């Protein structure tokens, strides 16, 4: 599943670089797992030493993956080669430094602390005039454990026992429930237009959520979201946001 983090074709990449006729000032890496190898390629096989910067939105940690083996150590090694590595949030930076502290001495953790910096993801369109239709709830997240999908379905089942006047809309998975409907959407404009018809959105993230574009997409279209008062969400919407909840599940 994590082959993109493990596979590095040194020979092919060296040929593609055409380094004898092309100069490189900056190396930008979105996969820190490859950065150590990229720096090695440039340093030992060319006469070019570009500055290295990057970004990482996903770290293989127990909170979000059940792999027997991960590429986290390669990720750390890659980030240590960077001038700066952007991450989605302060929450994610804190989590990564905590994991690094289990392995490295303080000297290296402090170096990572200076390298890793939050680079908040923006939104490409804002239209706060939502036009909700009916009692509609949107769950536009993956059906993974870290998104709280199974817990969410159980809560909707309980709600359906009490009332049958609502519809849950999903965009990435089928719930196969009498109260649910999956939307098959073919463009971003169509997706944003659909979001504007939702009454409320829900985020049930439990142990891991460094950011949620699904949430910011909906907020930018004027859709209020019920969100956990932990992970990145107080940072995203502000601690005084009225729809943060504290209950764990």
Where are the regions a protein language model picked out?
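Short N-terminal targeting/anchoring amphipathic segment
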Residues: 17-37, 53-54, 200-203
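Active-site proximal beta-strand in glycosyltransferases
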Residues: 26-28, 41-63, 79, 84-86
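A short, active-site helix/loop in glycosyltransferases that binds the activated sugar's phosphate group
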Residues: 78-113
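Short beta-strand->alpha-helix junction loop in the catalytic core
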Residues: 91-92, 110-128, 175
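Short alpha-helical segment that forms part of, or immediately flanks, the ligand-binding pocket
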Residues: 192, 215-220, 234-235
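Acidic donor-binding loop of glycosyltransferase active sites
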Residues: 196-210, 223
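Conserved acidic donor-binding segment of nucleotide-sugar-dependent glycosyltransferases
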Residues: 239-249
């Amino acid at each position: 599943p994590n082959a993109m983090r493990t596979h590095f074709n040194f020979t092919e990449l060296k040929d593609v670089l055409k380094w004898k006729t092309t100069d490189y000032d900056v190396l930008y890496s979105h996969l820190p797992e490859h950065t150590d190898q990229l720096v090695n390629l440039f340093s030992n096989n060319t006469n070019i030493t570009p500055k290295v910067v990057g970004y990482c939105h996903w770290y293989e940690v127990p909170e979000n993956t059940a792999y027997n083996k991960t590429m986290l150590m390669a990720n750390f090694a890659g980030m240590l080669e960077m001038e700066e590595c952007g991450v989605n949030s302060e929450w994610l930076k804190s989590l990564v430094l905590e994991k690094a502290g289990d392995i490295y001495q303080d000297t290296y953790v402090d170096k990572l602390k200076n390298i890793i910096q939050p680079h908040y993801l923006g939104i490409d369109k804002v239209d706060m005039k939502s036009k909700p239709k009916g009692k509609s709830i949107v769950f536009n997240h993956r059906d993974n454990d870290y998104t709280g999908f199974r817990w969410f379905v159980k809560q909707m089942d309980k709600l359906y026992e009490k009332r049958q006047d609502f519809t849950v809309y999903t965009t990435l998975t089928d719930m196969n429930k009498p109260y649910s409907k999956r939307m098959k959407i073919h463009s971003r404009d169509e997706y944003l237009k659909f979001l504007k018809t939702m009454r409320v959105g829900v985020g049930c993230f439990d142990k891991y959520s460094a950011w949620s574009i699904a949430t910011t997409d909906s907020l930018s279209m004027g859709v209020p979201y019920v969100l956990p008062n932990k992970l990145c969400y107080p940072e995203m919407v502000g601690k005084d946001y009225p729809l943060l909840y504290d209950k764990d599940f």
